[in-house]
């Protein structure tokens, strides 16, 4: 899980979702997981 100020999709499988007011990226590739914070 990478925590970044600005998150962006790395590949086409990455999906941007909002959970409890926190933006996250989930993907089939675990290396692409990101959270905005």
Swiss-Prot record:
<dbReference type="InterPro" id="IPR035977">
    <property type="entry name" value="Ribosomal_bL36_sp"/>
</dbReference>
<keyword id="KW-0687">Ribonucleoprotein</keyword>
<dbReference type="GO" id="GO:0003735">
    <property type="term" value="F:structural constituent of ribosome"/>
</dbReference>
<protein>
    <recommendedName>
        <fullName>Large ribosomal subunit protein bL36</fullName>
    </recommendedName>
</protein>
<dbReference type="GO" id="GO:1990904">
    <property type="term" value="C:ribonucleoprotein complex"/>
</dbReference>
<dbReference type="GO" id="GO:0006412">
    <property type="term" value="P:translation"/>
</dbReference>
<dbReference type="GO" id="GO:0005737">
    <property type="term" value="C:cytoplasm"/>
</dbReference>
<dbReference type="GO" id="GO:0005840">
    <property type="term" value="C:ribosome"/>
</dbReference>
<comment type="similarity">
    <text>Belongs to the bacterial ribosomal protein bL36 family.</text>
</comment>
<dbReference type="InterPro" id="IPR000473">
    <property type="entry name" value="Ribosomal_bL36"/>
</dbReference>
<keyword id="KW-0689">Ribosomal protein</keyword>
<dbReference type="Pfam" id="PF00444">
    <property type="entry name" value="Ribosomal_L36"/>
</dbReference>
